[in-house]
């Protein structure tokens, strides 16, 4: 199993621990991280957290969750899923995949990578909206 990132509208963090797992883009700039159960932006501001399998924003509102390999929004609508180390949208089109630790778009171009992730024991998801 490998680490996966959905980019553009959603970033998904996968890690085995909660200590400063950094998400970097293809230019090696840190664009976010998870630390002690908090999801933080690259400047260290807390923008959300994970609690009881729910993804919550900094106000405590549930904005998404993970359910049987499906990524769902807070209304329960499937917006994507994981299959064979591929991240697919609700229409089953491949959005992103991981190859040798590098996160690539469906066209094969490099998007970014994870730093500090050793092995997967727990899966943590947080949804960032950049647009």
Annotate each predicted stretch with a short phrase.
Residues 2-6, 12, 16-38, 43-46, ...:
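Long terminal segments
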């Amino acid at each position: 199993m490998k680490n996966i990132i959905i980019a553009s509208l959603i970033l998904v963090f996968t890690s085995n621990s909660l200590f400063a797992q950094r998400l970097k883009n293809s230019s090696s700039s840190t664009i976010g991280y998870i630390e002690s159960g908090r999801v933080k932006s690259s400047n260290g501001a807390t923008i959300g957290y994970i609690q009881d399998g729910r993804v919550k924003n900094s106000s405590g509102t549930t904005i998404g969750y993970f359910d049987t390999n499906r990524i769902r929004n807070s209304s329960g609508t499937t917006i994507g899923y994981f299959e064979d180390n591929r991240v697919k949208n609700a229409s089953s089109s491949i959005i992103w995949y991981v190859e040798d630790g590098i996160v690539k778009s469906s066209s094969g171009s490099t998007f970014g990578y994870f730093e500090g992730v050793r092995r997967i024991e727990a899966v943590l998801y947080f949804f960032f909206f950049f647009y």
